[in-house]
A protein has these predicted regions:
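Hydrophobic alpha-helical segments
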Residues: 1-169
Length: 169
């Protein structure tokens, strides 16, 4: 049986830590999601970048449709789902998207230099909103991947291993 490749929660404590982090910041979470600090399209770009790194099939499907609804072009979405930043991406969002990719690749433990660069490009409330959005999508990704891992184990490797083919845009 081939080993399960995607990132999952390794313990209930890790899962609970993420949930507590988000619950303790409910007001800031609401502000991050209301579209005033971070536009809906920007939020969906961030979520799709993290989802691409973590490879969650459930989040990919949902957030591609949300990104389409937010007005992101099919061409840009194709690039995002390939781990690339499109030339159609608003220039002021690129630093955050590159940071989000690094953040996800480092399993939410970014190096200090990219954190400082993020703070140079965005206000403190925007940086907080970006981090909350990244934490939310990471939690969703790991929940989805952990569910797939359970399917994989229960089915002796028949289900849950490979993410679904990337949706046609």
């Amino acid at each position: 049986m081939e080993a399960f490749q995607r990132r999952t929660y390794k313990s209930f404590g890790e899962f609970w830590g993420d949930i507590q982090h988000l619950l303790s910041r409910r007001l800031k979470t609401k502000q991050a999601m209301d579209g005033e600090l971070i536009s809906e399209a920007f939020r969906e770009r961030l979520m799709n970048v993290v989802t691409e790194v973590n490879d969650c099939r459930y989040c990919r499907s949902f957030h591609l449709s949300q990104a389409s609804r937010a007005g992101i072009s099919k061409e840009e979405l194709m690039k995002l789902t390939s781990g690339l930043i499109s030339e159609d991406t608003p220039e002021d969002e690129i630093p955050a998207l590159l940071y989000a990719q690094h953040w996800a690749e480092q399993n939410a433990q970014p190096d200090e230099k990219p954190v400082q660069e993020l703070k140079e490009h965005y206000s403190e409330p925007e940086v907080e909103a970006i981090h909350i959005i990244l934490r939310m999508i990471r939690s969703g990704n790991l929940i989805g991947n952990t569910f797939d891992y359970l399917l994989y184990k229960l089915s002796f490797g028949r289900w849950g291993q490979s993410p679904m083919k990337k949706p046609e845009l």
